[in-house]
Amino acid sequence: LAPDAKPNAAHKKLAELEHEGIQIIDVGYARGVFGKHEPQMSDEMRQDLEAMGVTVYVASHALSGAERGLSSKLGGFGPVEVAAHALRIIGRGVKVCVEISMMAADAGLVELHEPIVAVAGTGHGADTAVVIRPAPTAEFLDSKVDRIICMPRQG
């Protein structure tokens, strides 16, 4: 489950799901990604998710992180940011699904190159889901999206 601008919507849906036997990992972005230095998730929400058996993981943005810090100061784009923009051609949620899958892979929370379902959304709740076999960020191009389960129409 990915972060979005309105995490409460996705997290409320999660509370309604029967997820016994399914590992759910909430992957969030580190401070500063959206221009503010507060945590993206409140302590209360994190505790609620953990009480539901959800693993909560916060890390640097896999498809920008330090590279965006350089490009915002020095100008231009680095290759990782270009790859992120290319993924957005398919859909913002697809880009986020790829990104959070790699972040979870980097942390050892999912098996490398084994299929998982990644769910993401940007701004309006979870609206995109893919089956992906994630690679770690150091092997970004080895990640494979096997299926797009759902995504909103691009407008």
Model feature map: region roles:
Residues L1-G155:
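Conserved mixed alpha/beta catalytic, RNA-binding, or beta-rich assembly cores of soluble enzyme
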